[in-house]
Amino acid sequence: MSMRFTFWIMVGIVAISGLSQGMLLPAIAMIFEQEGVSSSINGIHATALYIGILVISPFLEKPMQKFGMKPIIVIGGFLVIISLFFFTQTFSFWVWFILRFLVGVGDHMLHVGTQTWITTTSDPSKIGRQVSIYGVFFGIGFAVGPYLASTVQYGLATPFIISTILCLIGWLLLLPTKNAFPAQDEREVKSKSSFSRYKQVVGLGWIALLGPLAYGVLEAMLNSNLPVYALRKGWSVSDVSFLLPAFAVGGIITQIPLGILSDKYGRDRILTWTFSVSTGIFLLAAVFDQYYWIVFACMLLVGMVIGSCFSLGLGFMTDLLPRHLLPAGNILSGIAFSLGSIMGPVLGGVFIEKIQYTSFFYCGYDYNGNSRNGIYGLHEESIRIKKNRK
């Protein structure tokens, strides 16, 4: 099987994974809101998926080096399929929490495997483009997810059944692909623990982790808390299901152009620009949040500007690290994303519950403004890191 064909199988699987994640967050948020669960508890429940990512992360590098990337992806995909199926068998707050946790474990295994495969097999001059295609396909799946979530009105099990079937199809397509192994420095693999390599990654490429961290906060906050805020404003389930994909669609539109621009001008410059512009867009959404179509346009624009920051951060990590550290770098990117995703729903839920007389979008404005300030010196710092590597 050709490398090119395998690449498209990988990004296709990522699209289906994105669909299941994009469905899971708003579907459960809407179900719990209709059942009278508080917004803060709803937000805490959403963190289960990302706790799963955190728990499995330290245990992926060694098996991937020993057994290859395909077994990690296959096992992760199978775990997602089984977990989604069991959502249809019961309705319980804590059982669903555990199932969300298992989906997080499986999804992260799948993503670390596919990310490592793409970043270690791609031409270095086309890393931005290839990772952007990965991001586009995940974004397409994630954008379709909320539409799938709206099928909950036909029965609680409906979105979970459809998602299970689609994940099974993607998993079966993966089985004929050939296994591949990440690049290794044999001396370091034998003499250093995984945690030593994680320390190296943080020392060389900590700046690149800001992209996945910021994306995790915003993605989880918008998909977990925005449905609650919108329903309380009196918008319908169909309105919410149409609004949520705007962020992901915006990211799809600009993902590849921003990836190509980052190959040309540097991922550090593009990341700095995205944080600055998105802060102003969130402020606009906060001022005009009583107007549905203005909010929709703002979510689309925010997605266009900052919806690529995960893939930009991943590409930036590839720029800063030697190839044998890329598996550890991809794992830490996932950890940064999951930490952000745990923070996002909790912060958003508390904001909605405690600050009831102002717009939810001020939460995004404040966070993005602080992120922008935090990376003000990013370009100069990245130059220093690159010089130290030479």
Where are these regions (language model features)?
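Helix-to-loop junctions at the C-terminal end of transmembrane segments
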Residues: 56-68, 255-266, 352
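Symmetry-related core transmembrane helices of the 12-TM Major Facilitator Superfamily/SLC fold
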Residues: 159-175, 361-376
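Juxtamembrane intracellular "pre-TM" segments in multi-pass secondary transporters
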Residues: 1-3, 181-208
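Structural signature of the two symmetry-related core transmembrane helices
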Residues: 71-85, 269-283
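Cytoplasmic helix-loop-helix junction between adjacent transmembrane helices
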Residues: 101-137, 316
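Paired small-residue
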Residues: 94-102, 293-301
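Central cavity-lining transmembrane alpha-helices of secondary-active solute carriers
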Residues: 47-60, 245-257
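Helix-loop boundary and gating motifs at the non-cytosolic
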Residues: 3-50, 216-229, 233
